[in-house]
């Protein structure tokens, strides 16, 4: 059986500092039934019409999905993957969503599913345990919290689960390296496995978060504030925040309801103290594989969950 993968639908702005929202993931369609036209082709899969056209002004009006390609498609070109996809002309998920609209879409859309076996996937025991501890802490936080999850237990999916299940207003995620910043950006914008058909921990009706990634300095505090206000989640390095002018640091401090510090054990005590002194302590949650820093000092903050190896 031949198939073709249709590109994702997303909104993206910015070059160095990027804001991204995934509106719909890739769609894999079956090529068994294809209608060819002089300007376009229509693939019919499970009764749904997917139109691919080389001309943005000529397409099947009845098709709910219309995709612009670099040339007139044919069934053989689709089978050979000899077509470049340009952009979506028409898609059921082409919507305008504000950060508040995204949060509202998460209400009652999270399922606390424990993984039973490969046929019944869900959150693992350490993930579900940490999530319950986080949600309990977030109801009435009074101090910084620490979640200890050993490597391989699914720390990132725990953060994603807390974001959606806790309906966090706006989250700052700090990481120690540029590489990890990019990895987490890719995870947060897709919600990892949470919305995949295999897991269905988050309902398909829930919108993907609007995620910002800061990789370079802003010209001024107003530009930074405008960037943050467009996002549900902002991911950056502690170094970016530390090197920002004081006025911009104040914007970071005042703009977020929650601050997730990933790989906290990699941060030396002096850097952590400088960072944590800026933010209200109750907003801070450290995620770490060990309660001890690489410099040998113990992490501060209340350990709300510690999963043993």
PLM ranges: what are they?
Residues 179-218:
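Conserved helix-turn-beta segment of the N-terminal RecA-like "Helicase ATP-binding" lobe
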Residues 150, 176:
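P-loop (Walker A) phosphate-binding loop of NTP-binding proteins
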Residues 181-183, 243-244, 293-298:
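Switch/connector loops and helix/strand junctions flanking conserved nucleotide-binding motifs
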Residues 216-259, 266-274:
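Conserved RecA-like ASCE ATPase "motif II neighborhood" in helicase/translocase motors
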Residues 154:
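Conserved glycine(s) of the Walker
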Residues 177, 236-240, 263, 287-291:
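A short beta-strand-to-loop transition that corresponds to the Sensor-1 phosphate-sensing loop
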């Amino acid at each position: 059986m031949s198939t073709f993968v249709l590109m994702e639908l997303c909104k993206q702005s910015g070059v160095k500092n990027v804001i991204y929202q995934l509106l719909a993931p890739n769609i894999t369609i079956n090529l068994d039934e294809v209608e060819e036209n002089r300007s376009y082709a229509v693939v019919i899969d499970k009764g749904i019409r997917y139109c691919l056209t080389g001309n943005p002004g000529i397409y099947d009006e009845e098709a709910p999905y219309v995709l612009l390609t670099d040339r007139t498609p044919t069934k053989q070109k689709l089978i050979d993957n000899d077509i470049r996809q340009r952009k979506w002309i028409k898609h059921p998920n082409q919507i305008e969503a504000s950060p508040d609209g995204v949060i509202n879409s998460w209400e009652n859309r999270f399922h606390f599913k424990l993984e039973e076996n490969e046929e019944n996937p869900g959150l693992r025991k350490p993930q579900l345990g940490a999530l319950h501890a986080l949600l309990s802490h977030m109801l009435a936080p009074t101090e910084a919290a620490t979640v200890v999850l050993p490597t391989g237990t699914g720390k990132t999916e725990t953060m994603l689960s807390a974001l959606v299940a806790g309906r966090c207003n706006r989250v700052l995620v700090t990481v120690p390296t540029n590489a990890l910043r990019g990895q987490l950006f890719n995870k947060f914008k897709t919600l990892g496995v949470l919305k995949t058909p295999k897991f269905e921990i988050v309902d398909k009706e829930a919108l993907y978060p609007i995620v910002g990634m800061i990789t370079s300095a802003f010209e001024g505090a107003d530009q930074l504030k405008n960037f943050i206000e467009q996002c549900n989640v902002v991911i950056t390095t502690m170094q970016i925040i530390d090197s920002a002018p004081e006025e911009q640091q104040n914007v970071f401090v005042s703009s977020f309801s929650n601050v997730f510090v990933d790989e906290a054990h990699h941060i030396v005590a002096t850097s952590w103290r400088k960072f944590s002194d800026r933010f209200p302590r109750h907003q801070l949650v450290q995620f770490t594989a060990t309660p001890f820093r690489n410099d040998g000092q113990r992490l501060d903050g209340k350990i709300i969950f510690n999963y043993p190896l």
